[in-house]
Amino acid sequence: MEMYRIRLGVYFLLAALLNFSCKPSSTDSELATPGSFILQESELPDYEKDLDHKGLLTALDDRYDESIRTGEHIYNNVCFNCHGNPDQLGSIPTAFKFWEDTFNLGKDPYSIYQVLTRGYGSMPPQVHLTPVEKYDIINYLREAYLKEKNPGQFFEIDSTYLAGLPSGSNKGPAPKEFKPWAEMDYGNFLINTYELVGKGAPEREQSKGPSPLADENLIDANFAYKGIAVRVDQGVGGVAAGKAWMMFDHDLMRVAGAWTGEGFIDWEAILFNGKHNISPRTVGNLHFENPVAPGWANPANGKFEDPRFQARDKRKFGPLPRTWAQYQGLYQFKDQVILSYTVGSTKVLESFGMESWQNQPVFTRTLNLSPTAKPLKMRIAQDKTAVALIGKGAILKKENGFMVMETMPSAPVQVKILIGSAGTKGLTDYAKSSAPPASLAVLTIGGPSRFPKKLSSQVTMGTQEGPFQVDLMNPPFDSPWKNQFRLSGLDFFKDPNKGVICSTDGDVWLVEGFTQNTGKLTWQRIASGLFQPLGIKVVNEQIFVTCRDQLVKLHDLNGDRETDFYEAFNTDHQVTDHFHEFAMGLQVDKEGNFYYAKSARHAREALVPQHGTLIKVSKDGQKTEIIATGFRAANGVCINPDGTFIVTDQEGHWNPMNRINWVKKGEFYGNMFSFNPPKDSTEAGMEQPLVWVERDRDQSPSELLWVESKKWGALNGKLLNLSYGYGKVFVVPFEKIGDQVQGGIFELPIPRFSTGVMRGRFNPGDGQLYLAGLSAWGSTQPQLGGLYRIRKVDQPMVIPVGIAATTTGMKLTFTDKLDSKAVQKISSYSVKTWDLIRSRKYGSKHHNEQTLQVTKAELDASGKTINLTIPSIQPTWGMEITYKVKDSRGIEREGLVQNTIHQLGSKTP
């Protein structure tokens, strides 16, 4: 048996694994020292400090075949996502290419092991891999890529080398299977995009080649793009621990199918096992299924023809017209899920179940319908499926290859449908002894708590020097439900001691203790099973959550604070099976309208109009409007005081570098792979960003927010940018010249967070900044989730908060007064510029790098603004200004501003 059982659960290393930075940036020479590893030796597990590296390497000879299989499995299931292979680019084309690139920190196995273990540059430390697994990866890379394809990077291992290796007393812990996504208790339903398949299904079709990747032929695949998977057998552990399930597709109001087996799904997805370009499939026996088509006939004409938007690949996406059918939400009562929707003007409640007949599962659909003006028709399953009906108000019939239920008009309907696999005998006889259809209304008033245990976590107060203190408020990772706590949004109630936090794993938590300063927080799980929540907002004390499939409003119906009704406030989302199209952030304008951003498809052209857009949802949830287009991976939304927006975007195809966009309605922001782009693919055909963010400064910007706190002194009213990629916070100084906003970023003087930072809110009670963070894709920071508070303390900041590009140079305005004499020393400044090339290729190198001479530096009358005279200044894609000055107290201050110049303003006075 192989020593290694593949651990696809290394979720935070997936997007950056082995990214050795083969093409060094201007700062790489500074990083190439042991001291610049992300983890220091003191932070490593004890076994790493006494590890028998010689023994681990020599053991590879005895287990060569096993080691190669293990390393290959890891690479193909994890590393390939980003790194690809010689025939296929990975999703991060700038990631290290083992078959052609050069290692920075040494090509011998021990040096590579150190980079894997301790992290370096944009690669996080691989803390969930054991030493055996790490050497298996290294062994595979050496044999598969380095030895023949990149021999200059292949290191010959000999006795002299082995003799010089550390020979400790242990080989680390034994590898073990680790699947936290499959072990978590999600509750009895989980919304996601699923493909329903039976045993013996063909391999997934996946395009290869240059970007944009070709569309696969998926017209016959049974995808539930907004699938609500409901567990129908009894037992603890939630949907993932079940043995039988039914799937409801709330785009089409259809039951997509039912299945039984071990394992629920194969967990192949970016936010499950981390795999890219894939959606999870069901596993086990598929007992019946329905095609991707309306579940109910059009109430106006009785036909099932699908009227929805048809994409380029002939598939149809989005919800049915509201006049046809509309998903209203779902209720929970104990472990029972009650779906609520309308067909025409008819209100429908539906619940699933499972019974047994002759040792075979019988799936049930219990439906309660309000009176109808005319008959309605619902497809149950293909006509070879065994079907029986209990109750009054409806009949069964065959129609065009399907078993169909047709209701009788003018009276309420209360029925239970029994469904068995094709070939099931005697189901009609069994129906005579099956329980009658239940009234579901009594289950829609709130039930007993499903998650009664409240959890607590400690607050670790910061003791850093400087103007900011960072308090760690980590979640209770020892949860009885094995939650991963990948925190993706937060907001506060009128009582500032109380807030709500969502996670990408589908949870919403009510958290208390923010302002009481008791040293701990209390966590109550109030919602679960949602589809990748990535934004949350409290509006008039009501909770709204941005999910990939809908904007959800949470209702507590009985006062226990848990969600009893998940209202589908807006379901206009156009969801496809692509892994990359997250729905990000949630903000509300002064009129009460909601805003979120929807990402485009990675390395592929858009299929639906919503791909790569900023989206507005009306205050009542009844209307959706696309505000701006052309985004690639827009991580959140910021609403500006003037009614415009800020949306970040990530380096990639048509994005030569990360960008912070000041967004205006109706404009296009550069991604030619988004839906219906302009014909002009040059820079003239798009809006320019506020700043092109250099990857060394921030690998992946997330959401911006305005400082709304007098306690933050001179930063009050200024703009902050959060970094998912590097776990940082930046201030964003900017100026506006004509219609163009331009500026830069400056990193706040605080330590990096242990997660990427996703969302931030200022607490109205204590006036401090709270941050929610996670690590799930493309972040260097390894911790799964984190909650933080940044407190401004009574120390001077001396931070640049203003910037201006003029015909004679640059102006930097600081929060505090500076020393005039120190400012005038021109050797204290360096200014570098570079260009980028925007194309369909992933990202861009620096081009036309220059160092500009500063010929004069002076302080203005306010004592806070430095005027730099730079004779050769010109508009530029990228600029980096470093400075070393003194404040008015004589304390040395140094820093770096990275910015973009589109236009030069008036001459410095």
Positions of the model-derived regions?
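Detector for the c-type heme attachment site
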Residues: C82-Q88, N104, T117, V127, ...
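Beta-strand-rich N-terminal accessory domains
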Residues: I157-T364, A381, I395
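The canonical Cys-X-X-Cys-His
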Residues: G71-P86, I137-L141, L787
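Short, surface-exposed alpha-helix to beta-strand junction/turn motifs within ectodomains of secreted
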Residues: K817-K856, I881-D887, G895-T900
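Flexible coil segments in periplasmic/lumen-exposed cytochrome c-class electron-transfer proteins
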Residues: A32, D50-T58, D65, N76, ...
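N-terminal non-catalytic regions of secreted/periplasmic and cell-surface proteins
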Residues: I790-D835, V897-P909
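Gly/Gly-Pro-rich "capping" loops immediately C-terminal to redox-active cysteine motifs
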Residues: E72, G84-Q114
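Beta-propeller domains with acidic blade repeats across secreted/periplasmic ectodomains
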Residues: P437-M797, V801-K811, S820
